[in-house]
């Protein structure tokens, strides 16, 4: 059964009956048949008498459809139907269309065409219509046409229109056939002669078509003439008066009979004329509502085109209706103009949109200056946006700072990482990048297009506006990054308008500076690409320079602090490097790493590739000395490290812990000697490596920086050596003070204090050889000289009236010390000793002196050999003196 149903569905439709089978156009008929579709959408075609009736079809069932006959012509016609399921169908019946003839007295909505009902009113069908668009010469129009302006100048008060009274053949030929040849013109003459003959034939055909009316009219006139000739007596002419009266009465009755019909005709004609006017001039009638719709859609160019067209057609009309319509349209256009002004001034839009709005406003009001209004409003909006943005981000920053403080107080270490200060700088730069190019393009467009007498003054005003915007932007960024760098004049001008941003940690501040420097450079580069002058971007250049200096200073301060913190990492273990027995600890390596890392971080600040024409920091003389001093401070920061080690400038974090031994923090000659070795290594080796790194990072005047740093480090080295010598010399002070000679030695020998001074020198020599062999001679010479000088000063204070035994012992001790310490005794101290000894000649026992010296050489042989062994190496200065 399903197969039969499917087969039935695929059969073509067949029309077997219609109800009714005839009728006028618009008659609703019922179509019956088989397989007339499965539903409404299945029927895809329905033609009744050749007219598409699918639009009026209502599907009822596969065997019934209701439809309405369209505007078909009279006569029988087929019903053609097609479906998706069955395809094209067939019809066994036909529908006949007839046209109902309206009588002369029947009411009708339209005037009845009487050409078919009244004899002699046949329509003229055989007369061809005149082709208005045909060429008068019968030639094809030329593709090249002369300009109307030139023709108007050559043929004033003439026209090329064939229907005009001032028609000029020359104009017509030049306009339509300027490139015609002689042969073409000859053909044109033949065409015009043939056209003239055709016109005569056409007139003859017109008379033939109306021959019945003409003959009927002539016959009627002839019959009337004959009747008049027959009326010979006066009575007949008197009857004519009655006839005239009867004719008038019949005319009056006829008019009364057809009054309603004629009135309806007049009303129909008036309605038809009104509809014709509405259809013909519907553009002006619907223009008001169309303007409103176009305003909602933003189709401004459509509004302007329609308004321009209406203005050209109806601006000077005398028709009251059209004048009223134009008044309403003008009011709508005034609203439209105000809307465009508001959009142009109140809302910042893209440059393309601004240009369109300015163009439209200029078309509506040529005397206005919308470009200048847009520039001034754009400037006010942009400056206000900058200050509003600062307020907005300041509130966020304060809220973030408050939340962080609350978390810290509640011992919650989850601190918000949002950096509103950096977000403010980034957003401000993005605003300038998106809006300043549009402002500049707008200003250039105004300058190139305006012919105002105030153009020069307004150009200066525009430059001042642009400078003010960039100045405010740079000051806002500077206030956020380096508030102390704001000029006093700016602070005085703007007062409290600048925000007081919450304090941020040093590492976040450096990060902000680094990112802000990058975004500022990008801003300058983009503005220069958009043809901004260097004068305009100069405030941003100064901002960039200040940020670079601040960033460089912060990185140097950070590097100095990191070098100072190396005091935690020193272990006082030395390595001997070369034959010169130069020594160092791990500290110089740590120091070099920190310095190089700091220099690497300053690479961005020193770079000159951020934007075209970026100046080097060293190029400005007022910055050069400051930057050189910064790098010198960085390199010589090792002094701070040693100062903290020697408890000279020890911060709180290096304070002695309760369980720590006190001796670990005390300054000793050992630490001083090791520190001197590290300083010498830094001066000799590390400074050269640091200089190469500075050159790689873009630092200028490296030689000057190295020279100043070397001088300061050398002075620091000398100071530490002097401190070491002072500490070594202080070891002799109690020994010298004990030389009172109240008790003399029991045997022939030098005094105990002299022996201890010799042994002290040996110990100092050993310490120097162990920790700073290159300083042994320098330190021991100065120490021995200081000790002997102090001893001589001490002897000079003794009582001069001493006994010969005491004098002899003094000479023995002094001579023994001179002999034992001769390696390090300078010529000056020897002269002083000889002078002092010469003053005692004759007061001491020379024989006992020689015996005591002999005994000293025996008893202190090892100590003397140690001192003499070092003296044997004096020949090679490079192995016993420092290279610094």
Swiss-Prot record:
One of its GO terms (biological process) is vesicle tethering involved in exocytosis. Residues 178-206, 846-874 form a coiled coil. Residues 1-11 have a biased composition (Basic and acidic residues). One of its GO terms (cellular component) is exocyst. Residues 1-27 are annotated as: Disordered. Component of the exocyst complex involved in the docking of exocytic vesicles with fusion sites on the plasma membrane. This is Exocyst complex component 2. It comes from Caenorhabditis elegans.
């Amino acid at each position: 059964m399903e197969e039969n149903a499917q087969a039935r569905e695929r059969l073509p439709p067949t029309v077997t009956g219609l109800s009714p089978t005839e009728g006028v156009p618009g008659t609703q008929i019922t179509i019956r048949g088989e397989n007339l579709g499965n539903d409404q959408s299945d029927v895809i075609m329905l033609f009744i008498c050749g007219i598409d009736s699918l639009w009026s079809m209502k599907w009822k069932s596969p065997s019934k459809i209701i439809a309405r006959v369209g505007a078909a012509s009279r006569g029988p016609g087929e019903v053609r139907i097609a479906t998706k399921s069955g395809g094209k169908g067939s019809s066994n019946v036909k529908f006949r269309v007839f046209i109902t003839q309206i009588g002369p007295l029947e009411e009708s909505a339209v005037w009845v065409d009487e050409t078919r009902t009244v004899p002699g009113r046949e329509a003229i069908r055989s007369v061809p219509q005149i082709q208005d668009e045909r060429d008068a010469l019968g030639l094809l129009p030329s593709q090249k046409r002369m300009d109307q302006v030139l023709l108007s100048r050559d043929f004033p008060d003439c026209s090329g229109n064939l229907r005009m009274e001032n028609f000029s053949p020359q104009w017509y030929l030049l306009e339509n056939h300027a490139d015609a040849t002689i042969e073409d013109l000859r053909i044109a003459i033949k065409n015009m002669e043939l056209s003239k003959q055709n016109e005569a034939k056409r007139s003859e055909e017109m008379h033939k078509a109306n021959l019945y009316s003409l003959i009927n009219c002539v016959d009627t006139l002839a019959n009337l003439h004959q009747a008049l000739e027959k009326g010979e007596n006066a009575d007949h002419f008197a009857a004519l008066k009655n006839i005239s009266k009867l004719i008038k009465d019949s005319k009056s009755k006829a008019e009364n009979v057809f009054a309603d019909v004629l009135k309806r005709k007049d009303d129909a004609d008036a309605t038809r004329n009104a509809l014709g006017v509405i259809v013909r001039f519907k553009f002006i009638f619907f223009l008001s509502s169309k303007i409103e719709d176009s305003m909602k859609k933003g189709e401004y160019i459509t509004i302007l085109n329609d308004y321009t067209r209406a203005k050209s057609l109806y601006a000077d009309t005398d028709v009251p209706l059209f004048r009223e319509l134009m008044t309403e349209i003008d009011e709508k256009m005034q609203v439209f103009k105000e809307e465009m002004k508001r959009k142009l001034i109140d809302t910042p839009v893209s440059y393309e949109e601004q240009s369109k709005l300015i163009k439209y406003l200029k078309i509506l009001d040529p005397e206005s200056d919308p470009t200048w209004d847009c520039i001034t409003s754009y400037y006010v909006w942009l400056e206000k946006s900058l200050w509003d943005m600062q307020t907005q981000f300041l509130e966020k920053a304060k809220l973030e700072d408050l939340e962080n403080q609350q978390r810290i107080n509640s011992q919650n270490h989850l601190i918000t990482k949002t950096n509103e200060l950096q977000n403010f700088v980034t957003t401000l730069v993005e605003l300038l990048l998106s809006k300043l190019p549009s402002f500049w393009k707008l200003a250039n467009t105004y300058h190139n297009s305006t012919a105002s007498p105030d153009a020069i003054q307004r150009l200066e005003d525009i430059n001042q506006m642009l400078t003010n915007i960039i100045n405010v932007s740079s000051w806002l960024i500077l206030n956020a990054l380096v508030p102390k760098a704001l000029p006093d004049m700016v602070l005085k001008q703007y007062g409290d308008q600048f925000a007081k941003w919450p304090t941020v940690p040093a590492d976040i501040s450096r990060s902000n500076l680094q990112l802000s420097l990058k975004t500022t450079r990008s801003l300058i580069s983009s503005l220069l690409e958009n043809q901004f002058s260097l004068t305009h971007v100069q405030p941003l250049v100064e901002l960039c320079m200040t940020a670079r200096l601040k960033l460089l200073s912060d990185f140097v301060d950070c590097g100095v602090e990191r070098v100072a913190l190396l005091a935690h990492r020193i272990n006082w273990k030395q390595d001997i490097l070369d034959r010169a027995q130069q020594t160092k600890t791990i500290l110089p390596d740590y120091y070099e790493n920190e310095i190089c890392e700091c220099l690497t971080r300053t690479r961005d600040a020193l770079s000159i590739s951020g934007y075209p024409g970026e100046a080097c920091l060293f190029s400005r003389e007022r910055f050069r000395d400051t930057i050189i001093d910064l790098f010198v401070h960085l390199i010589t920061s090792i002094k701070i490290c040693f100062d903290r080690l020697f408890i000279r400038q020890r911060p709180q974090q290096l304070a002695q812990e309760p369980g720590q031994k006190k001796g670990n923090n005390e300054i000793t000659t050992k630490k001083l000697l090791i520190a001197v070795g590290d300083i010498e290594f830094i001066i000799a080796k590390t400074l050269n490596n640091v200089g190469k790194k500075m050159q790689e990072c873009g630092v200028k005047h490296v030689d000057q920086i190295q020279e100043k740093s070397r001088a300061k480090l050398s002075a620091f080295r000398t100071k530490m050596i002097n401190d070491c010598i002072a500490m070594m010399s202080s070891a002799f002070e109690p020994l010298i003070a004990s030389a009172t000679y109240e008790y003399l030695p029991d045997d022939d020998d030098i005094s105990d204090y002299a022996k201890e001074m010799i042994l002290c020198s040996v110990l100092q020599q050993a310490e120097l050889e162990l920790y700073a062999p290159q300083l042994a001679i320098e330190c021991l010479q100065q120490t021995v000289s200081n000790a002997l000088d102090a001893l001589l000063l001490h002897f000079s204070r003794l009582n001069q009236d001493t006994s010969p035994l005491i004098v002899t012992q003094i000479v023995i001790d002094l001579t023994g010390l001179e002999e034992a310490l001769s390696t390090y005794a300078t010529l000056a101290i020897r002269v002083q000793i000889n002078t002092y000894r010469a003053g005692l000649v004759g007061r001491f026992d020379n024989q006992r002196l020689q015996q005591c010296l002999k005994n000293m050489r025996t008893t202190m042989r090892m100590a003397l050999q140690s001192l003499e062994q070092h003296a044997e190496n004096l020949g090679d200065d490079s192995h016993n003196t420092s290279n610094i």
